[in-house]
Amino acid sequence: MSKKALCIISGGMDSTLCAYLAKKEGYEIIALHFDYEQRTQEKEKECFKQICKALKVEKSYILDVSFIKDIGGNALTDKSIDIPKNELCTSDTPPITYVPFRNGIFLSIAGSLAEKENCESIFIGVVEEDGSGYPDCTDEFIQKAQEFINEGTSKNFKVCIKTPLVRLNKAKIVELALKENVPLELTWSCYESEDEACGECDSCLLRLRGFEKAGFKDKIKYKS
């Protein structure tokens, strides 16, 4: 019986690369996407489906966690809050694009699904560089989440949360993705737009900087 990994895939560059790395390690991939009614959900869902097709994933889940929007308090789900433009977060205070405890919620649900599917690993594309001020993007948080899941699931089930990108910067991620033939043109990073990436939000800036430092051109369309 093949080993199985649950890959949390947002439709973005990091989580997609993680799924490709899982496949390279010989895992049968079960793909998981969360719909929390963020601004670019339809685009992200479309990317998720295309990525699953490219990976030849046979089993995937799209789970409705729209209660995250009801909690609010962030610019990704609340359109009355402006998304910051042309500035990267450099403080230890979470930016307004931080969705409170999002990765904690995602991993709790992923733990349940991983137990049901008997997955030995969960792959999640957290990156500490992206998570300046994001308390749920650190290696320390992930280790505690793994302990929490293993403590709260059946005794004959143990899962390892794998974060192969957590210490990498965006340039290294771009380089690795292209080396592994990851179709980055199928991925989406923009926080605000679904047709053409804005090129100005925190996520777009990190992506563009990564491509520039790696010496490659991003193939997705930008407004600016």
From Swiss-Prot:
Pathway: Purine metabolism; 7-cyano-7-deazaguanine biosynthesis. InterPro entries: QueC, Rossmann-like_a/b/a_fold. Pfam families: QueC. The keyword Electron transport does not apply. GO terms for molecular function: ATP binding; ligase activity, forming carbon-nitrogen bonds; zinc ion binding. It catalyses: 7-carboxy-7-deazaguanine + NH4(+) + ATP = 7-cyano-7-deazaguanine + ADP + phosphate + H2O + H(+). SUPFAM superfamilies: Adenine nucleotide alpha hydrolases-like. Keywords: ATP-binding, Ligase, Metal-binding, Nucleotide-binding, Queuosine biosynthesis, Zinc. Binds 1 zinc ion per subunit. GO terms for biological process: queuosine biosynthetic process. Belongs to the QueC family. Catalyzes the ATP-dependent conversion of 7-carboxy-7-deazaguanine (CDG) to 7-cyano-7-deazaguanine (preQ(0)). This is 7-cyano-7-deazaguanine synthase.
